[in-house]
Amino acid sequence: MKTCMNNPIIQQKFQDLQQKALKNIQGIDWEKPIYIFVTPNEYIGTVASVTDEKLLASSLQNLPTNWKPTKSNIDEDATWNSLKNGWQIAYKKHAILLMGPGNQQEAGTIRQTMREILNEDYDESFMSTPFYDELNQLKGDLNMISHINVLPIPYNTFMKLQLPENVSAQQTYLCSEIKIYQNKLCIQNTLNSNDKEAEKILEQQVTPQLTHFESFINTNNGIILYMHTYGEKLLHILREDPNFRAMLAGMNQVIDADLILRSIKGEALLQIQNFSESEVPTFTLQAQLANQNFMEKFPDWQKSAQKKKDMFIRPTHEGYHISYKNQHFFLNAGNNQLLLSSNAQIQCPKVKNSPHIMQSVTYMSINFDKLWRSSTNIQKNNSTNFIQSISEQLKSLEFKAKNCKKSTIDIYFR
């Protein structure tokens, strides 16, 4: 990631940061780009330009208590400082490298990683790669280039949703231009591939715009995910979240939920009202089907459920009521369409306050206030922890993909 210091909001943030954490730090050129990266061993690194090495050394002593250097030494590579908060600093004539965080046992590993970076030949460095040139051609206030698989959840999930069936995440990388406004971030994303065949597919793939379930979208829900998909892809996305993974495991005790979801092909609309106190979120899934042959298996699944405790399948006038322990699901399929819900009101009414998603082939929104309403005991995982950790600062998020290559993310702050 590369930052541009010309944006007035970024300048103000850095002034605030300098007053609080970097007070009196001198010797760093804050006007030049700052590069941020993540190492293969998952440490965060930051590189900035140094204008005066001696001035920098003396001013490091003016850091706040929780940032003050605890150890300092000089060798042939650089001047080294260990900070109290788990970060390591190395600087030499023209550059400063900050890396971490890590505990005391990790300090040696972090320093070794830093030493390898400091001693890299140009031909081995990031600067010699096409990615470096591509990064410097981006024109956002913040610019980022990354392989999809190393992005954090849910950001990597957004990108994977765009991919055609015959292009893998391993083949693609993301370029993002981030514009910063007073209460909003606008992120313009482009998916690229160094694989010529994959890049050709990304450029030429024509995905129809979402229309089939658009009128069913209800903006009172915490999460709305609307996309073109096929069963195996949707299964993979759901299994990344432990709450849905536990739900699928429970359903598979009674019916073959994997078989049902693998029958999906076409548009799919997943709406999560909120994360409830049980393991099962309050949700509704509507999807087009390649076939509904699984409905023929319900009589056999019913007989099997009758022989087991804590589970049942009951026909209703709208489909089937499926129960496993304290988990309840309601399913119906007809006209090659699936409706699966955690709510007994299985018929999904059309709503009038649907968001404007025209010209989108993938759409997702998160309303952070509505998502965590009445949720005090949800199953913790990286995804929910990430969202909860930022929900105090964020109001909502909206993701739109225009095609397989281009997408936007708008993040609104409180």
Language-model region placement:
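Single conserved position on a long alpha-helix in the C-terminal lobe of the eukaryotic protein kinase
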Residues: Q19-E134, G266-M364, Y412-R414
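Long, K/E/R/D-enriched contiguous segments that form extended
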Residues: N221-S304
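Leucine-rich, highly hydrophobic segment in Treponema pallidum outer-membrane-associated proteins
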Residues: G100-G102, G108-I237, I366-R414
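Short intrinsically disordered coil segments
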Residues: N62-T65, E203-L210, P242-N243, S354-H356, ...
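N-terminal mature-domain "stem" immediately C-terminal to a signal peptide or N-terminal signal-anchor/transmembrane
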Residues: M1-N7
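Short acidic/polar alpha-helix capping motifs at helix-coil junctions
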Residues: N7-I9, K139
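Generic detector of solvent-exposed, compositionally biased contiguous segments
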Residues: I9-K20, S72-A78, M144-S168, P242-I272, ...
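Generic recognition of flexible, low-complexity loop/linker segments
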Residues: P33-I34, Y173-E177, T211-E214, D256-I260, ...
